[in-house]
């Protein structure tokens, strides 16, 4: 029990490493957004106004993710998924691959839904998108955070070019039991190593500081550290 609690403490500390690194970046232009009427607002103000306009059903809809199996080839407007997006009942998709398919779905969200909120399109980009790198467990053996960051950068560039804007990575579960079946996705059994390598991968995906326009560049995607604490072999 003591070992598990200690591992959890270091795991949580490791997952907070990326924001800590972010504070070393030089100040950059703040993120803004453009309304449908062409007005440019600070991102926080834009989001506050958008949230105020949303119905409860639309807020719930933002929590719904479609999976790739729900999407048929062509004719997105004619599917139930297309209807759900247009009605604001769908916030994003998971493991949908193909730029034309994603573009068609995004056009429904932006042009046909009441508020024009774009979809979040996520995928398990674990160790590369088109270019395949060694698995995270192997990469972590190098203790090379710059190499890990580069993997994130290349993965983000390739995935974003295909319409992906969100990855379910890095995985920072601490692998203390070899019987657990997902050890290859993580950085091994050392909590400190898992933290610094996970932070480096996150920087590669997102850039250094999400509070600036860097995250909006075409070659960036959002990271999502996983999984829930105590899910892995701890």
Ranges and model annotations:
Residues 21-234:
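Glycoside hydrolase catalytic-domain context in secreted enzymes
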Residues 1-22:
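N-terminal export/membrane-targeting signals
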């Amino acid at each position: 029990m003591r070992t598990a609690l200690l591992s959890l403490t270091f795991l949580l500390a490791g997952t907070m490493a990326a924001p800590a690194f972010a504070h070393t970046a030089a100040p950059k232009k703040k993120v803004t957004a453009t309304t449908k009427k062409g007005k440019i607002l600070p991102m926080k103000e834009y989001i506050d106004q958008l949230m105020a306009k949303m119905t409860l059903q639309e807020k719930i809809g933002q929590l719904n993710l479609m999976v790739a199996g729900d999407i048929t080839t062509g004719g997105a407007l004619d599917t139930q998924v297309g209807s759900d997006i247009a009605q604001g009942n769908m916030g994003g998709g998971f493991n949908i691959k193909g730029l034309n398919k994603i573009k068609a779905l995004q056009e429904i969200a932006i042009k046909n839904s009441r508020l024009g909120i774009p979809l979040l399109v996520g995928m398990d980009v674990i160790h590369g998108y088109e270019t395949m790198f060694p698995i995270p467990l192997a990469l972590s053996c190098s203790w090379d955070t710059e190499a890990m960051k580069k993997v994130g950068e290349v993965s983000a560039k390739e995935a974003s070019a295909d319409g992906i804007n969100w990855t379910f990575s890095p995985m920072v579960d601490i692998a203390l039991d070899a019987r657990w079946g997902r050890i290859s996705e993580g950085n091994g059994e050392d909590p400190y190593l898992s933290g610094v390598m996970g932070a480096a991968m996150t920087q590669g995906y997102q850039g250094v500081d999400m509070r600036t326009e860097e995250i909006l560049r075409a070659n960036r995607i959002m990271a999502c550290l996983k999984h829930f604490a105590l899910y892995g072999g701890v």
